[in-house]
Amino acid sequence: MSDDPIVLAKAALRLEAAVRRDAAHAAGGETAAGAVARHGIGVLGERSFRTISGYWPMRSELDIRPLLGLLADTGRDVALPVVLGLGQPLEFRRWRPGQALEFGRFGTAHPPPEAKRLEPDVLLVPLLAFDAAHHRLGYGAGFYDRTLAALRRHKPVLAIGVAYAAQRVEAVPRDAWDQALDLVLTEEGIL
C-alpha cells in the first residue's frame, strides 16, 4: 500500500462513499432513477449533440436506463463504455433499447463487438463521490480520467457525473491527472 497522502485519502473516502451510496440506493433507488430521467432529459433534451454515452448500472450505481431510453427516443446515438484493458481509455459502442449485452471486465455490461463504435459528445459518468467543484471520485482504475483526457485533447465534450445527492462530500482528494466533471446530475437536479 502506498504512503502517498492522496492515495490514502482516496482509499478511505471510497470506503465511506460506497456505504453512503448503498444506503441512498436502498432508500430510494427506483424513485431516484425516475427523477434523474426527468431532470436529465430536461437538461439534455435542448442541447445540441449527436452522441451520448451512459453506463449500465452495477452495484448500487444510480440507474440511468430510463434516461438512456428517453435519449434514444430523441433520435440521438446512445453508447455504452467497454473496458478494453488496464491503462487504456474506454471504447464506446452503440446501444439501442432491448439490445442484448455482454458482460465484461469488472462486472460491466456492454454491447457486443459488432456494435458500431462511437465517439461521445456527452458522457454520463458513474461515481462514488463528488464535491461542489465537480471533482469526482471513481473506483480507482482511472478509466474515465484517461478517456476524458483523450477526448478533450481533440474536441469539447460535456462530462456529467450521475449520483445520489447523498454522495456529495466536502472535498474530493485529487491528483493532477484527475478530470473534473462539467455538471453533476442527481435526483434533486443539476449541480
Please report, for each region that a protein language model flagged, where it lies by residue.
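Conserved phosphate- and dinucleotide-binding cores of soluble alpha/beta proteins
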Residues: 2, 88-191
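N-terminal active-site beta-alpha-beta segment that forms phosphate/nucleotide-binding
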Residues: 2-119
